């Protein structure tokens, strides 16, 4: 019997994308079965190619589509003469064609299904057309009493048919009242809390400019602030902190990052913000600054950047700066820059910059590190590729 199509339940659409309108297609399939018993089967004397037919059957009294089973007891042709051939035949049909799948089996002495064979797909039937199996079962196996397939000399065939009916479409529109979880606004809310200086409990004086903040937020975000407020330090007792080694704008950008995880002005002050991030153990901000400085490396600033990276233990930035120096040195020797022809007289050599000369005097160990790396480096491909820094 057929099943009426039902629209998708709300739970089916509870995950994944939600469309404004939808369609649910139900392909109707009518399933029914038929049993055919042939009494005194061993007396069937039909020759090869001759046929026995069952009576007609259908899915129900109102179904005008009629079927029958066709058996060739001694096969259909020379190829199948040692087999029993079995087919499903469409006797009459009000439609021009119909598609159906079928399954044949035998019932043994215990009324159990055995030797089942099933169509692998839905076949196209027209009136008078049959589909089945030319070699359904070997005759010698079937006639052997030890196999129990002919109890009392009765052959019982069981057939299951699945007929594809018309498909049904159900369409509609998604309920506009579907719940939507708002996006998280934690960063915006904390940023507003700081900007509005509400419920603050400590003050920072940065070169004369006051900034109010919340101890709990700072302690949660920075191990340095956590230690400052946790112990009986003077800053914790007075709720007042003096900072004289940072510019107010740099401190403000650092605080914005602490509250929101963002630093919109980072590119303008990446070097000074790196120092602040290192001082207050803000590892993610530190790597963000390293990445910004890496993207702006040049012949003129690479030595100063290397010194800055060494001073604040920015190991990824340091490695990138040394790599930049080595690549530029090799490319200069090859007479090219960034994969293009390069006249070395038109560009300042890194070793001739004031930053490099200053580094020789103040940080000679960095010069040694750069030369050691250069000595072990191989000639690179043209261009100066940049590696993406690992975010903490």
From Swiss-Prot:
Keywords attached to this entry: Nucleus, Ubl conjugation pathway
Record carries keyword Nucleus: yes
Domain of life of the source: Eukaryota
An example molecular function term from Gene Ontology annotations: ubiquitin protein ligase binding
Pfam families: BTB, MATH_2
GO CC field: Cul3-RING ubiquitin ligase complex; cytoplasm; nucleus
Pathway(s) where this gene product acts: Protein modification; protein ubiquitination
Alphabetized InterPro entries for the sequence: BTB/POZ_dom, MATH/TRAF_dom, SKP1/BTB/POZ_sf, TRAF-like
GO BP: negative regulation of protein ubiquitination; proteasome-mediated ubiquitin-dependent protein catabolic process; protein ubiquitination; regulation of proteolysis
Record-annotated disulphide pairs: none
Residue intervals of the MATH domain: 31-161
UniProt keyword Nucleus present: yes
Subunit structure: Homodimer. Heterodimer with SPOP. Component of cullin-RING-based BCR (BTB-CUL3-RBX1) E3 ubiquitin-protein ligase complexes containing homodimeric SPOPL or the heterodimer formed by SPOP and SPOPL. Interacts with CUL3 and MACROH2A1.
Protein function: Component of a cullin-RING-based BCR (BTB-CUL3-RBX1) E3 ubiquitin-protein ligase complex that mediates the ubiquitination and subsequent proteasomal degradation of target proteins, but with relatively low efficiency. Cullin-RING-based BCR (BTB-CUL3-RBX1) E3 ubiquitin-protein ligase complexes containing homodimeric SPOPL or the heterodimer formed by SPOP and SPOPL are less efficient than ubiquitin ligase complexes containing only SPOP. May function to down-regulate the activity of cullin-RING-based BCR (BTB-CUL3-RBX1) E3 ubiquitin-protein ligase complexes that contain SPOP.
Family (UniProt): Belongs to the Tdpoz family.
Protein name: Speckle-type POZ protein-like
Source organism per UniProt: Homo sapiens
Gene name linked to the record: SPOPL
């Amino acid at each position: 019997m057929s099943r009426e199509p039902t629209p998708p339940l709300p739970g089916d659409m509870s995950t994944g994308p939600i469309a404004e309108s939808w369609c649910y297609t139900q392909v109707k399939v009518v399933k029914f079965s038929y049993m055919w018993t042939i009494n005194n089967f061993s007396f069937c004397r039909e020759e090869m190619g001759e046929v026995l037919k069952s009576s007609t059957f259908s899915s129900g009294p109102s179904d005008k589509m009629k079927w029958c089973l066709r058996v060739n007891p001694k096969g259909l042709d020379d190829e199948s003469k040692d087999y029993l051939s079995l087919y499903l035949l469409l006797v009459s049909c009000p439609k021009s064609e119909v598609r159906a799948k079928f399954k044949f089996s035998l019932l043994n002495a215990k009324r159990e299904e055995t030797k089942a064979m099933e169509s692998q797909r839905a076949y196209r039937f027209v009136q008078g057309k049959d589909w089945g199996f030319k070699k359904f079962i070997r005759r010698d196996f079937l006639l052997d009493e030890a196999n129990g397939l002919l109890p009392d000399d009765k052959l019982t065939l069981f057939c299951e048919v699945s007929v594809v009916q018309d498909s049904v479409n159900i369409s509609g529109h998604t309920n506009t009242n579907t719940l939507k979880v708002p996006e998280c606004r934690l960063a915006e809310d904390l940023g507003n809390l700081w900007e509005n200086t509400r419920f603050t409990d400590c003050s920072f004086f940065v070169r004369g400019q006051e900034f109010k903040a919340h101890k709990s937020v700072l302690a949660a975000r920075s191990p340095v602030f956590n230690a400052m407020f946790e112990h009986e330090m003077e800053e914790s007792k007075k709720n007042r902190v003096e900072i004289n080694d940072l510019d107010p704008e740099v401190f403000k950008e650092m605080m914005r990052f602490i509250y929101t995880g963002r630093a919109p002005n980072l590119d303008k002050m990446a070097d000074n913000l790196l120092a602040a991030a290192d001082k207050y153990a803000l590892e993610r901000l530190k790597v963000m600054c390293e990445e910004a400085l890496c993207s702006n490396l040049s012949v003129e600033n690479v030595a100063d950047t290397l010194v800055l990276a060494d001073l604040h233990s920015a190991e990824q930035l340091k490695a990138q700066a040394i790599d930049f120096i080595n690549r530029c040195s090799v490319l200069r020797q090859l007479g090219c820059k960034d994969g293009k022809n390069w006249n070395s007289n038109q560009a300042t050599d890194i070793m001739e910059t004031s930053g490099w000369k200053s580094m020789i005097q103040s940080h000679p160990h960095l010069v040694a590190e750069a030369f050691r790396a250069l000595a072990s480096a191989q000639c690179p491909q043209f261009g100066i590729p940049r590696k993406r820094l690992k975010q903490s």
